[in-house]
Amino acid sequence: MGVAKEGCMQHIPSIAFSSCNYDENADLTPLHDGVLKVVKMVLEKGLPEYTCLNVNFPALPPFKGFKGCRMTHGSWINEVDHRTHPHGYDYYWMVGEYRNDEPETTDTDQWAVNHGYIAITPTKIDVTDYDWLKNFEL
C-alpha cells in the first residue's frame, strides 16, 4: 500500500494488489482477469482525489467475485524477524500473523478474502479523526 499511497498523493490513480498466497513459487496467472477488471474500472471511472484502492485476492481460485468492503480492525503480531545478511549487516524481515479483532463481522476485507471474494477496499490519504476534532478543547 505504501507505493499506492505515494502515487495517490501525486494525483496518480493508484491501486495496490495483493495475494493471500504466500508461496514464493505461487502461480499468479489466475489473478490476471481480476487485475485487468479493476484497472479498467479505475481508468474509465477514475478515483476520488486522495483515494486509492487496496485489492486483496484469496490464496486460491475460483474467486466468487468482487466485494467492496472496509478494512478489518486488527493488528500484526510477531511481525518482525531480525536477521543477518551474508555480508554481515542486520536487517528485518516481515513475518508474523494477522490477528483479526472482529472475526464475526461480514463487511470487512478479511471476511471477503476468507470466503473466496476479491476484496476491494478504498482508502484515503487523510487519516484525520474529524469526530475527535469536532469536540477538541484544551
Which sequence ranges carry the predicted segments?
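Internal, conserved structured core segments that host functional sites
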Residues: 1-21
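Structural signature of PLP-dependent enzymes
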Residues: 24-25
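Electrostatically charged, flexible surface regions
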Residues: 28-138
